[in-house]
């Protein structure tokens, strides 16, 4: 006589906590499995919502164009295109709009080099 899934779930639903614990232990033993969460899932959710350690150095940065010198607008648009790979219209919009992320996920050294290039072309740049 085979039980249906619904009957099994109904029986489990009616069990007490100690009975559920015994059932889980019996299943572990019978089928040689564990009920432990995978390590990746445990590491993905830090306990208590704790912040990342302060000493951990950030290794990916975003370059944000916060403003520009109007006299050097064309040179800056050209530089934004060269750095980001954007088209002419997108680069122009990014320069004029301000606050746009020009490039993201770059190394510290690359971020410093891009910042230097954009500032030389008249841009005001923030690295986050």
Swiss-Prot record:
* InterPro entries for the chain: Ribosomal_bL12, Ribosomal_bL12_C, Ribosomal_bL12_C/ClpS-like, Ribosomal_bL12_oligo, Ribosomal_bL12_oligo_N_sf
Q: Name one GO molecular function term.
A: structural constituent of ribosome
Asked if Cell membrane is a keyword of the record, the answer is no
Which keywords describe this protein according to UniProt? Ribonucleoprotein, Ribosomal protein
List, in alphabetical order, the GO biological process terms annotated in this UniProt record.
translation
GO CC, alphabetical: cytosolic large ribosomal subunit
What the protein does comes down to: Forms part of the ribosomal stalk which helps the ribosome interact with GTP-bound translation factors. Is thus essential for accurate translation.
Tell me, how does this one assemble?
Homodimer. Part of the ribosomal stalk of the 50S ribosomal subunit. Forms a multimeric L10(L12)X complex, where L10 forms an elongated spine to which 2 to 4 L12 dimers bind in a sequential fashion. Binds GTP-bound translation factors.
Name the family the entry cites.
Belongs to the bacterial ribosomal protein bL12 family.
Put simply, this protein is called Large ribosomal subunit protein bL12
The scientific name of the source species is: Brachyspira hyodysenteriae (strain ATCC 49526 / WA1)
């Amino acid at each position: 006589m085979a039980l249906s899934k619904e009957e099994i779930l109904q029986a489990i639903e009616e069990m007490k906590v100690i009975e559920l614990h015994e059932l889980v232990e019996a299943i572990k033993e019978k089928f040689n499995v564990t009920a432990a969460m995978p390590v990746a899932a445990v590491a993905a959710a830090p306990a208590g919502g704790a912040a990342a350690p302060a000493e951990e150095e950030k290794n990916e940065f975003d370059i944000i164009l916060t403003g520009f010198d109007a006299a050097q607008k064309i040179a800056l648009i050209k530089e934004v295109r060269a750095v980001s790979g954007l088209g002419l219209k997108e680069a122009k919009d990014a320069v004029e709009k301000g606050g746009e992320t020009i490039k993201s996920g770059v190394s510290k050294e690359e971020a410093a080099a891009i910042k230097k290039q954009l500032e030389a072309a008249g841009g005001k740049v923030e690295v986050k």
